[in-house]
Design a protein with these regions (language model features):
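Bacterial N-terminal signal peptides
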Residues: 2-11
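Function-determining sites in protein domains
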Residues: 17-211
Length: 211
């Protein structure tokens, strides 16, 4: 981890840059916006998340994990949504094909409470991380495969799946959120503790002190 710890903060060596280049940029990748927006609208279900991670796979159904603010001082809501059938559909015709979005469906959604303090820390840490991985002026790159799209406080960051450094830690935290939503209630406190530990590691990584 030492060679990738300086992600976005300390001057990179050439070797470190090669080892862990950011795959993310601002907004949607070219030609993905309409698809991504359709899936987001379906999976958000009228909520307004402060943080979300949308997965647009090359095959299979689309999914999202998100945090929705609660009322003053109350727990937030952790949502994990999955399309019932793949939204993106290629329809072959005699002389050409066309894309259709299957949005007339009801996604599978699980909602559980998450402590407000932890949710706010996730929003803050993800904002700091994503603004370093995808600074202003860096647009989301062209993608022909799976697209991951983060949205935090109204700003979208998209690209290929991060496989190292701070980006990989965000995915670890998202996976723990999903585990919390799918697991037993008695195991949630353990998941929250694991997320807190991962956030500590994320802060160390960004500060260049992870070892």
């Amino acid at each position: 981890m030492l060679t990738i710890a300086a992600l976005g903060v300390l001057p990179w060596t050439t070797a470190a840059a090669r080892e862990c280049e950011s795959t993310l940029g601002r907004g949607w990748p070219p030609a993905v916006g309409n698809y991504g927006t359709a899936v987001t609208t379906l999976l958000d279900g009228g909520t307004k998340p402060a943080l979300s991670l949308l997965t647009l796979p090359t095959r299979g159904v689309e999914s999202a994990v998100s945090l929705v603010p609660g009322k003053e001082g109350a727990d937030w809501t952790l949502r994990h949504s999955r399309a019932d059938e793949r939204v993106y559909s290629w329809v072959s015709q005699t002389d050409r094909g066309s894309v259709q979005f299957r949005t007339q469906q009801t996604p599978e959604t699980v909602e559980i409470p998450i402590p407000a303090a932890l949710a706010k820390r996730l929003v803050s840490n993800w904002t700091n991380t994503l603004t370093q991985l995808a600074p202003n002026g860096r647009t989301a790159p062209v993608s022909e495969g799976e697209v991951l799209s983060f949205q935090v406080d109204g700003v979208r960051y998209s690209g290929a799946r991060p496989s190292c450094g701070a980006g990989e830690l965000l995915l670890k935290q998202a996976a723990l959120l999903i585990e919390a939503s799918e697991g037993k209630e008695k195991k949630r406190d353990k998941r929250w503790t694991q997320i807190e530990s991962s956030l500590d590691e994320l802060q160390q990584t960004l500060a260049g002190t992870a070892g």
